[in-house]
Amino acid sequence: MGEDEWNLTTTDEDLPEDVTAVYMTPNATTHFGVPPLLGRGLIPSDAPDGQDPQPVVVLSHKFWQRHYGANSDVLGRTLRLVHKSYAIVGVMPPRFTWGDADVYLPLKLTQDPKMQYAPPLRLKAGVSRAAANAELQALIQQFAKDTPSHFPPSFRVALQGLNDHFVERLGATLFLLFGAVGLLLVIGCTNVSILLLARGTARRHELAVRAAMGAGRSRIVRQLLTESLELSVAGAALGVLLAYQGVSLIVKWLPENSFPHEAAISINLPVLVFSVALALATGVLFGLSPALHLSRPDLAGIMQASTRRMTAGVRGKRIHGILVAAQVALTLLLLSSAGGAIRGFVRLMHTSLGYDPHNAMSVAIPVHDNTYMTWEARSQFFEQLRARIAAMPEVVSAGISTNATPPSNGWNTHFEILGKPVPQERELRTNFVSPEYFTVLHIPLLQGRLFDHAETMRGARLALVNQTMAHQYWPLGEAIGQQIRVPKLKGEPPYSPAAPDSDAWLQIVGVVADARDDGLREPVKPAIYVPYTMKMQMFTQILVRTRVEPLTVLRGVRAQVHAVNPDQQVMGRVRNLEQWITTQQEWAQERLVALLFGAFAVLALLLSVLGLYSVVSYIVAQRTNEFGIRMALGAGRTHVLRLVFASTALSVGGGLAAGVVLSLALKGMLARWAEGSSMDPAIVLAVVALLMGAATAACVLPAYRASSIDPVTALRYE
């Protein structure tokens, strides 16, 4: 299947509406295997070989709802796009959102070497990717003989599945979060085991009576496991309810374009079955050990001690201690990981950008086919737009860029320096801008001068370099006056017209400060800025700095565009630059990790405190008689407090030590799976201090109760 994408505009209304159009070969419907909701899809007769395509259009579901109010009588109506009428022949279902398009039009494939297509493929059943790669590589080699400039010798085919394309970007993060969920599950199950063991130990007399009356060990185990499973099922039901409510929130936190538009992320039947099965399995697994331990009571000892409060015994205390230590260790690991993720995200938030995104926005304006086909006409159109927008009272300044809107600027290309050899593999980023661009983004000039408006409009062969390039190639500060050449600056009309001789030598007239040009984390690359008339594009951005919140000015900006050309639309998705930054893959991904890890860590901390509180409360209850005897013999409250804290000190201390070792051992994995995360010793020490404080707080209330015991009451305690 072949496809192309373009931005069109409706021309049957007062104000033009931006429409994202995907042109498809007529086999698209069968290729994707998705039948239309209404009418039909594209068919071969819509784009006959050697002829212009038929004026038919298939609507996306969202455009059908937005533009036609989901009217089922839409078939046969006419939609005018850029003054051309198209007959509506179909509407696609909600799940089909290929290209996030509004409309689908028949595509006419051409042999024009300037046209490029990225056709999605569907492999035949039984054909491996390796076999398909080999077959396609042979085909590419044949193409290279006809158009060698499009297919250099190093060109290789590497098929990638659609799911792989998305999993590649987010897969490591999902595995990391799955690991965090697993840790939280183990911590929760450990907590349940502690509670079951404590409750079961308190029931040893009851269980011994049952055994003495003939209850077999298997029956006692079944009873205890049933109680454990009741907790698991109740917890699973509550968890599923919370998941149904929380999944939409988590999807909102996901980085934009993390999944295909067609992906339906919801709690479906497989997820439900997995959750219930996991709940039952953990209920059996973590309830089995306490059940087996409690199903072998010492009948003689227990019955003889029936008039006294039962104690857990050495083995029971050891199991309690191990469970508490494991819970503390895993909680420390999760808290340390969360601290590292949060620190990495905070560092990313405070990354020096080199430009000021506050109160600035980018307004994208697509040029229609067969309009402004020369560089003079196109530059005059955009300069008129820029001047009108800059004159608005809410606007501080406005500039033009065809490919340099932060946070990802420019395109990489080979270059030459006059009198200085440059390795073939070296590249720089080329940015096409107007002189006002630097004023709008507050990028300072460090040396020399900017090119001015007159030089831009006549296509003067001038260039500015960033600080990184100046230091790399002219470390002594001699960049001004040097000459540089970018061979690919040559125009390709009518889509990319350019000023005459744009691919000739350019003179460097200034050095500007570095600005991040490849996302938020990648180091700044060598870059040049040239007048945007050196190579015009079909999509151009007007960068606007405002005195107020930028999006409140958007209506006025649209009115200015309409005043210059009533048929010209503004692209639908307009954001201020701060919003563009927060939709970047690394920003949204680290935010997701930090938020979820933080939430999991807080839950783990609460579970650990609850588990430790339960253990200490149980110990105090079991040793009430002992504490009464000690106090009757003269022991003070401080002595009793010390005994209570000492009863858990070994378990907590061992858990902290194990958690520190685990955290430091696994910090490399965290850094690899969550880029930017930093779990250094300071974070681990802070978490240790936090857990020590939490453990102390968990022990305070039971310890206070123990130290406040009336010796006479304690001696009578059963």
Write out the residue ranges for each language-model feature:
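Conserved G/P- and acidic residue-centered "switch" motifs that form tight phosphate/ATP-binding loops
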Residues: 39, 60, 90, 191, ...
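Hydrophobic alpha-helical transmembrane segments of multi-pass inner-membrane transport and secretion
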Residues: 170-205, 285, 316-344, 589-625, ...
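Alpha-helical transmembrane segments of integral membrane proteins
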Residues: 162-167, 196-222, 226, 246-372, ...
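Intracellular coupling helices
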Residues: 188-232, 296-310, 610-651, 708-716
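Mid-to-C-terminal secondary-structure elements
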Residues: 6, 20-46, 53-175, 248, ...
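Membrane-helix entry/capping segments
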Residues: 15, 50, 133-183, 201-204, ...
